[in-house]
Amino acid sequence: MSENEITALFDLWNSALQTGDPKKIALLYETNSILIPTMSNKVRHNHEEIEDYFDHFLAKGPVGRIDEANIRTFGQIAINSGIYTFTFRNGSAVQARFTFVYRWNGECWMIVEHHSSKMPE
């Protein structure tokens, strides 16, 4: 898996955001994945909880952009961590640190861990 292919996984996720459908986003996550979201204090542990988070997050009209990516691969596992910025429909923006951990399931790459936290400054 090349760095470009891992970067494309973020583009796929960001495109799913643009659909406005939380179910489409949740399908990119393993059923037992963990989401530590940007704009919520609640850790999400499954598709139902992940959909619930994105249902609220999508109401803001987010568009993501990676500012810095650090990609590493370990066989069936790939990690993309760095900084991204979400711009919202109302013109506001939030910069956050992120980590996506992907696992190859034999057919496609799935998100198994996603941690996103607003920059402290």
Language model regions located:
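A beta-strand edge to alpha-helix "cap/lid" segment located at domain peripheries
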Residues: M1-K24, I34-E121
